[in-house]
Amino acid sequence: MTMTRRTVLALLAAPVPAAAQASAWPNPLVSQRADPQILRHGEWYYLMATVPEYDRLELRRARSIAGLATAEPQVVWRKHDSGPMSRHIWAPELAFLDGRWFVHFSAGEAREPWKIRLWVLENASPDPMQGEWTERGQLKTQWESFTLDATVFEHRGRRYMAWAQTDPAKKNHSTDIFISRMKSPTELEGPQLRLSQPDYAWEKVRHIVNEAPAVLVHGGRVFMSYSAAGTGAEYCLGLLWADVNADLMDAKSWRKSPGPVFVSSPENSQYGPGHNSFLVEADGSVLNVFHARNYRDIVGDPLKDNGRATRVQPLAFTADGMPDFGPPLKEGP
């Protein structure tokens, strides 16, 4: 068969299946790393995630996503022996703000392991693999209560933080999603607005949880994914969205998906996909960075199971511009 130039160009322009795109890097990308975030800055990709020991913060860097799989992790900070920041070191996120590097993370105390709050590290070096990481203290919210999973983003010239927190007025110990403008990388401007709480049955399996917000601005909308339910196979993603020109600090600007948008796939042996982040490539394509296990059944507390692994796959969009997460892809090279 003779192929014309037009035919060749059409083939080159045709969408590449998600599984084919994902083959550019291993799946999983990194074993035993939960709550992953990949940040592209300059010519580098940076990866941070929760380590299974919950005792330190690691940073990896590579020229490609695939390179992160074999990049040597550098420990940038270790937990304290006692007091604040001495237990449950979770969900670090790297950000380059106002010409400096910051890590926002969650941590508890050795004597009160569930006294989890938000904390900040800062590094003035232009290279986050160099310089000194300095503790900048607690990033305080409206309440002194269980608080975790901060993510910082900028939109229309304003900086925001979204996070998960327990409202002390609630008796069910649920965690909800909140948002606030930021005065600086270490301080909220206030007030804080509740964007989502566990309303649906799928958000209340094993635990009553909305947590781990992640933000993507795409196609005229601001999307915020979040994770729901317990941390086993029931773990999944929900989705909030607002118009790109809306007031993000007005609850009426936001809509919420009535069902989960990213769930376990027994067919692909992927369970509990969640705590994601979004990575926008230079060409505008979007990747979903998340963790999942390759088995369903867990003995004991899922938080003590080390099987969550970092995974990356392309994110598609429907004809009307909504994210189409698809299923978590089967493991492969």
Model-predicted regions and their roles:
Residues 2-3, 9-12, 19-333:
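Carbohydrate-active catalytic/glycan-binding domains of CAZyme proteins
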